[in-house]
Amino acid sequence: MKEKIGIVDTLEERKPYITRKQEKGQEIPLGCDNNSLAGAISQRACVYSGARVVLNPVTDAVHLVHGPIGCAGYTWDIRGAKSSGIETNRTSFSTDMKEIDVVFGGEKKLSNAIDELVEVYHPPVILVYSTCIVGIIGDDLESVCKTASQKHTIHVTPVKSEGFNGNKSDGYKAACDALKRLIKRPSEDEIKKKAPRVPETIKPKINILGDFNVAGDVWLVNPLFEQMGIEVIVSMTGDSTPKAISRAAEADLNLVQCSGSMTYLPKWMQAEYGIPYLNASFFGIEDISLALRRTADYFGSEEIKKRAEQILETEINRIMPEISRVREKVKGKKAAIYMGGPAKALTLIKGFDELGMEVVIIGTQTGKKEDYEQISYSVRDGTVIVDDANPLELAELLIRQKADLMVAGVKERFIAYKLGIAFCDFNHDRVVEFEGFDGFVNFAREVDASISSPVWKAVRQRI
C-alpha cells in the first residue's frame, strides 16, 4: 500500500499548494496565483465565466454571449442576484456559433443578433461576451460593437473574455474594463472638488463595489448608510442599472467588498477621478461595525459618526440574544471554508469566531501571497490552508481535519453531503441574505440548522 506523506495524499506537483498556519512574521510556504495544474481537476472557471459572474447582476442589460450555446447555458443566471426592477439579465442570449461560423467567421451573425435584440427588448446596454472560439477565429468584436452602438444609439459594449486567455481572475479584469466604458466622466472641476472632508451640509455619496445582491444582500446594507446620511449611488453590480453605473464617478468614496473581483475598478477610479476607496465587508458584527465606523471617520462629520454609533448600538443589542442562543449550540464545532476569493474567506473566519467555532480548513481559488499571509495570521494553529484545491483533496482534508461543517459554493456541496458533513452555501445558490445584521442572524441560524440536522445520525459520518 502506498504510504501517505504530507498533509494530504495528492499529486507531487500539488503539494506546494497545501500548507498549515504559520506564525506571524513568517512567510507562508504556499504556492498560489499560478495557472491550475493540468490534470488536477481544478474548481476554477475560465476568463469568460469570471467576467459573466461580475456583470450578470446588471439588471436591465442584455447579456449576449458570442460563442457556442454551451457557454451561455453554463453561466445562465449564474449569480442568483435579485433585482428590484426589470430582470432582463435573467434571460441568457447566445449567437449559438456552429462549425460554419468557425470557418467563415461570426461577425455578421453577431451583428444580426444585436439588431434583433434591440428590436425586441430595447435595452439601454448590450454586453457582448467573447468566448474561446471568437478569440481563435479572430472575430473583430470591437468593430461590430462600435458599429452597432452608432446604429442604435445605445451602449453595445464588448467584454474581452476569451476563456483560454487566462483564468477567472482575468475575467474579473475584463468585466471591470467593460464597466469603465459605462461610467460617465465628470467635468474636471467636479474631479478637483473630491476631498476627504465633506461639509456636514452636503450629503456624502458612496459606491459599493463587489457586492452582487445575492439573495437580496444589498437591500440589508444600503439602509444602514442611508440612516447615517450617506447616499449610495450604485452597488456594482448587485441590483444595478446602466443608468446608476453611469453616475459612479459622482461618488466621494468607493467601498470595496469583493476585492478579488473588483480591485481593478476602484484603483482606476482613484487614478482617473480622484475617488479614494476603502476595503469593507458587511458580514458579521465585527466587520459591519468596522465598515460603518471607517466610512464615518473618512468623511469626518461628527453627526455621521454619532449616527453610526447609534445604529451599531441598536442593531447589536437587537440581534445578540439570537446570536448568543446559536453560539451555545454550535460552540466548539469545526468549520471548513472554501471560497472563490480571499475577501469572503477572511470575513468568514471572523464570523465563525463570533459563533465560537473553529476554522480547521480554509482555501480559495484566486488568493495571492499577501492574502494567504493574512489568512494564516487570522486562523488557529493546525489550520490547513489550500490554494486551488480539487475535489479529492477537499474530501480527504474534510476527513482528516474532522470538520463538522463546510461553507463553500454549489460545486463543493456534494463533496460534503457524500461524506455526511453539514454544508452551508455562501455563494450564488443561496436564497437567504447573509449581509447586514439580520443577514448574520440568518447565517447563524442556517449553520445551526445544518449542523444540528437529524439526517446526519442516519448516514455514515466518516469514510
Swiss-Prot record:
Annotated function: This protein may play a role in the biosynthesis of the prosthetic group of nitrogenase (FeMo cofactor).
Q: Which UniProt keywords apply?
A: Nitrogen fixation
Q: Which InterPro entries match?
A: Nase/OxRdtase_comp1, Nase_comp1_CS, NifE, NifE-like
Which is a GO BP term held by this UniProt record? protein-containing complex assembly
This protein is called: Nitrogenase iron-molybdenum cofactor biosynthesis protein NifE
A Pfam family this chain is assigned to: Oxidored_nitro
Q: In which pathway does it act?
A: Cofactor biosynthesis; Fe-Mo cofactor biosynthesis
